[in-house]
Amino acid sequence: HELKEFHADPHPGNFLVDDDLNLIALDFGCLKKIPNEFYTPYFELVIEENRNDKTKFREILTKLEVIYPEDSEKEIEFLEGLFHELLSIFTKPFQTDNFDFSDESFFQEIVDLGKRLSKDKELRSQNGGRGSKHFIYMNRTFFGLYNLMFDLKSKDILTSKFSPSTIS
């Protein structure tokens, strides 16, 4: 969060851990810089109150280019429902001080949602890709990290340190 840069290909072959437990990136080919105009609204969505405030939520989704000015109210409501559901799952690790990534039910929620969305005809009918170009890297990163943490059966991971509410 301090650098506003991240590694968009998190898998074990791209990192080492030294004797002092420092994480060392080996593959720099997928380092991405996050511009403030994406960073700020993206991480505002981690905050549950912002997702539950319909006006604020719509405003943030518009900033992130998920909702377009020409969208119908029906399209907007569909996208808001979809992103609310997605974010309610993907931000779970940041809603508590510690998170148990070994919890199979959390990972199963992600898998089930992915399967359901891949078959959703209304989603397929949406015009083109939605959202800022930075979404693909952020979502790939979080999915990769969650998958890695699940595979490692990581428990009691301090996630509050990385919540936007603690970042100045």
Model regions and ranges:
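Helix-rich C-lobe and terminal helical cap/extension of kinase-like folds
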Residues: D18-S168
